[in-house]
Amino acid sequence: MAKKPQDAQHNQHGKHAQRGQQQKRGSKTQGSRPAHAPAAPVRPWRPGRDKFLPVSRADMDARGWDQCDFVYICGDAYVDHPSFGMAIISRVLDAHGYKVGIICQPDWTDPASITVLGEPRLGFLVSAGNMDSMVNHYSVTKHRRHTDAYTPGGEEGHRPNRAVTVYGNLIRQTFKDAPIIIGGIEASLRRLAHYDYWQDKLKRSVLLDSGADILIYGMGEHAIVEIADALDAGLPVDQITYINGTVYRTGSLDEVYDYDLLPSWDDLTADKLNYARSFNVQQQNMDPITGHRLVEPYPNSVYVVQNPPSATLTTDEMDEVAELPYARDWHPDYDAAGGVPAFAEIKFSISSNRGCFGECSFCALTFHQGRVLQMRSHDSIMREAELLTRDPEFKGYINDVGGPTANFSRPACDKQLKHGVCKNKRCLWPSVCKNMVVDESGYTQLLRDLRQLPGVKKVFVRSGIRFDYTMADASDEFLRELLEHHVSGQLRVAPEHVSDAVLSVMGKPSRAVYDAFCRKFERLNREYGLKQYVVPYLISSHPGSTMKEAVDLAEAVRDMGYMPEQVQDFYPTPSTMSTCMYYTGVDPRTMEPIYVARDPHEKAMQRALIQYRKPENYKLVREALEKAGRRDLIGYTKHCLIRPVPPRPGETSAGGGHGTGKKGGKGHGGAGGAGAKGPKGSKGHGGMSRAQNAAGRNRAAQGRQGANGGGRRS
């Protein structure tokens, strides 16, 4: 793209009910260190503030700037690294000659906080950060989180709920005529009418509620430069309606051509099934080649127009984005607070790709990054790895090389690049498409070359792999390479469930595929004389899961011989297929009814079943088993989940044969499968996988957190 880049995360409420609380939080001084935060270590080699874009008038003066072209307001702290959307967007514009100033986590109760850099010449850019602000702030049970990894010192409370809307309105009140462009995961996934889990209702496009002029959705490298060039040429912002990857509002459709009309706001609020129909049309038009322009009507002759998606990046463009002159650190202003915790997760990790053709129903990536895989070149990745080895804090370990799915290193098929993705077919579900080119050799060679770099001791693969793709590979070279060199005792994969009915709704492969993968993994481990374990990620109360399926999952966990520490209760985040199912009660692809566990108590029971050994879950598990008609699982025999009487202090809730769950206790199995071995000497006798107790990653946020933020899984 000859200097055109960015992660469209610009790359992500009860406002009145929490107003007093928000005002208190908003008044905190950015960069102040909470009592629990460690002091930042002395690191004289860190980049100076001149390596970052301006965050103050003094910084502007040091560069000789009288005025910024753009001021970027973001809900995250300033980390100048390509895993942070704000950094990518601002560096892309900087590379094109635009002057960009940064205001991170302003006090949203004080208009003066967004005036510190003055009014920009061309406009304001706004994003909530690498995560949707509501997902960042609240757990699936709607309890406020106590920490914020994207804030200095990990202290929560420096970002408002629904940050894009709050920031947008604050700018509009302060600079009435300034163009406002919103983007990032929060704006992208709320670009049209969407279900909001936290208020349990349908909400309008965030473009309308934020007061913005243009919304960039998806990965916005192309769009942001086109918008900047148009504004720089003197085009009024209300005339910038032609750029792919953007959403705008209009009062007339007279000059809007070749569009599909979605159900109106009135239709959507009158009947949930209309939302399901609308969502299905939207997800069928997420491809840059085949996607149509979409129009969503609102009352009073207001129309929200979504232009077709922006073109995917070429490999050369991906390289340009990754190799812009990032400082690759948090801003020095955060040193006193101990830095930004999220940076530690990615400092020595490498993003090699974006996009995902896995298309899991509960994941937001299809709606944000698209299904066409975009890959950096081998040479670019190697250059970044060499850069990491020169960091004084590098200890020889590259923590991750991957993306949404690590072992995807090329588009699913050649057809996608010429004709676009299939509208009514998935690449991997219900089985691997016959046209798919399954090739893991490029990624395998990349891992080999990274291992050979001077100073590199080990390269980990933590992004997650798609095991059905690996099983479809005629060669087992990648899996052999993975378990011999790139697994640290545990390989995390995401079967998510064991019920084929639920797996079908999720868009995941059948249990048989997962069991076959586990058998192959164990066979190769025996061949190499290794003791490594598959650690499965599991989701409870996903649409399609009744109490029967939840009990099936609990029995599978019993047969693994260990208790998962990290269990993800289904979180209905904006604009996923699963969230549409949760809200409407139907599968939008077929319009067939689907069971949904909406009641918080039922969701708690389904989750407790997976962790039935925990004493605090005893009552919920017993109630769930009785509701499911499975009293046979209450007793003292080895197949039982719990005993007839509550556990005494120091005991687990588990039924007979499960031991105490402590080191040396006996595990238990029963289901047919690959064979399981519990952790720390516990003994199993069959089950879904060979597994070891592991905390895993916090997966409470939306799928893979949009572009490059947060944990990833496949």
Across the structure, where does each feature detected by a protein language model lie?
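N-terminal [4Fe-4S]-dependent radical SAM core
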Residues: 40-67, 77, 273-349
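Conserved SAM/AdoMet-binding glycine-rich loop
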Residues: 65, 72, 88, 103, ...
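N-terminal pre-triad scaffold of radical SAM enzymes
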Residues: 73-78, 335-364, 397
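Glycine-rich beta-alpha loop elements in corrinoid/cobalamin-binding modules
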Residues: 77, 85, 104-299, 306-307
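Terminal amphipathic helices with adjacent charged low-complexity linkers/tails
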Residues: 109, 238-286, 302, 309-313, ...
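Flexible glycine/acidic-rich beta-alpha junction loops that bind and position SAM and/or redox cofactors
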Residues: 132-141, 189-191, 221-226, 251-253, ...
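Conserved, mostly hydrophobic/aromatic
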Residues: 213, 321, 356, 381, ...
